């Protein structure tokens, strides 16, 4: 714990003992009025760090519950342990392939070491937020536009790892990073939409051509089979006549014998 690092070099002096005795004496002489000023209630999600005569007192934060703070010689800071969210302002930057984009992100973090967050950095929350902006810009600048559009999760994990490694010394733990939105220039959006439309049309033409090829091959196979079987050809001829006569129409069909048709074809 960081508290032990500070207390290891601290040796109480004579004046410290005198100040401590005076504080207790004042507390007892003004009792019970002093209770309203010296007794603090720490909530479940908070921790209180006490500094006595400017030095860290005890190596662990106090709370939750009732905490006694001595008058004149004790000062205290309350630290919230709940997860906090920070919406990173829109970052305008260039990708690796020189495309200007705007990125919106959110960072979720919490205080894991209240003492370190007070003793090692002036403002842990502000420092974490500024570091989040710079880390996001640095990571996105090394990725291409295609990577940004397809690998948001991987980028978020990389930014989280960089943030968590740096803020651990400050007593801050980064829970997660989310890439909320990636905005492209209007010209780029129109170009990508046109490219996607052209790709869809190309795919549709390929599918249509493949279908026609399959159908022609099926017809060719059926024709070959019918040509080798006169009975099957005759049956197909009769089926065609039935289909034509099944509907109310004005078509007049005059059937001819198949032998007559074959003779005409041979001629």
Curated annotation (Swiss-Prot):
* TM spans (from-to): 17-37
Entries under PROSITE patterns matching the protein: BAND_7 (PS01270)
Organism superkingdom: Eukaryota
UniProt keywords, alphabetically: Membrane, Transmembrane, Transmembrane helix
Residue span of the signal peptide, if any? none
Could you tell me what this protein is called? Stomatin-3
- Gene Ontology CC terms, in alphabetical order: plasma membrane
Task: Tell me which SUPFAM superfamilies the record gives.
Answer: Band 7/SPFH domain
Q: Which InterPro entries match?
A: Band-7_stomatin-like (IPR043202), Band_7 (IPR001107), Band_7/SPFH_dom_sf (IPR036013), Band_7/stomatin-like_CS (IPR018080), Stomatin_HflK_fam (IPR001972)
Q: What is its main location?
A: membrane
- Topology relative to the membrane: Single-pass membrane protein
What family does the Swiss-Prot or TrEMBL record give for this protein?
Belongs to the band 7/mec-2 family.
- SMART domains tied to this protein: PHB
Subcellular localization is given as: Membrane
